[in-house]
Amino acid sequence: MSLIETHHLSYLPESHPVHVALYRDLQNASFLREQLLAGNTEFEYAFIDASMIFSRNHIFAAIFRAVRDYINNRLKSKNVHSEIVFSLGGSNNIADAFRRFGISESTRDLLVVKVSTAPEITHESVSKHLEHNIKALPCPFTEESLASMTDRARLRKVYKFGSVGADTFKRLDEVEQGKNGSETTKEAARKHIDMLLMGAIAIRGAT
């Protein structure tokens, strides 16, 4: 069983819907990584370590950039799915992006993205393939699920937001621990972090 979501992103062609699924307690990370390294086209997905994803907006920003670059023949990596992982990196170092955001043998929570680049890639075909090949517990692709998986300390370190970002992460941690603030403070902090992450993705390669 998979709880796959299919989305048509604004400002992108209807012919390229995006399929997203989230899993917990992954048991076959090594197998999935081997398929990617072997170039097995049946496993052409963006396999992302969910501990490095802050929110739905975070991953959708990377997907949007990758699909847009795919449509405009501006890919810097092998295909649109590797480009999604690359886009998350916020820099022009492809190897670093895969090391930080891609699936590894130690990945336990997995976010899977598949872009329909051909008519035969459908919600049903992706769902069936994932159901047969992902050994993990499917879970809803929600903000709550992602928040329970995110390694905020590592995310802060990778994106290097400086004191402003560090203060916002600290404020969010304090609210969730019941030390300070309110639900409004929490939402404001999450929105600010989202903006920082989406900005990093949008300007990748500009400097």
Swiss-Prot record:
Oligomer status and interactors: Component of the EKC/KEOPS complex composed of at least BUD32, CGI121, GON7, KAE1 and PCC1; the whole complex dimerizes.
Subcellular location: Nucleus; Chromosome, Telomere
Taxon lineage: Eukaryota, Fungi, Dikarya, Ascomycota, Pezizomycotina
Keyword tRNA-binding: no
NCBIfam families: PRK14886.1-1 (NF011465)
Provenance organism: Coccidioides immitis (strain RS)
Family statement drawn from the similarity comment of this UniProt entry: Belongs to the CGI121/TPRKB family.
One Pfam short name: CGI-121
Designated name of the protein: EKC/KEOPS complex subunit CGI121
UniProt keywords, alphabetically: Activator, Chromosome, Nucleus, Telomere, Transcription, Transcription regulation, tRNA processing
Function text: Component of the EKC/KEOPS complex that is required for the formation of a threonylcarbamoyl group on adenosine at position 37 (t(6)A37) in tRNAs that read codons beginning with adenine. The complex is probably involved in the transfer of the threonylcarbamoyl moiety of threonylcarbamoyl-AMP (TC-AMP) to the N6 group of A37. CGI121 acts as an allosteric effector that regulates the t(6)A activity of the complex. The EKC/KEOPS complex also promotes both telomere uncapping and telomere elongation. The complex is required for efficient recruitment of transcriptional coactivators.
GO CC terms: chromosome, telomeric region; cytosol; EKC/KEOPS complex; nucleus
GO biological process: tRNA threonylcarbamoyladenosine modification
Main location: nucleus
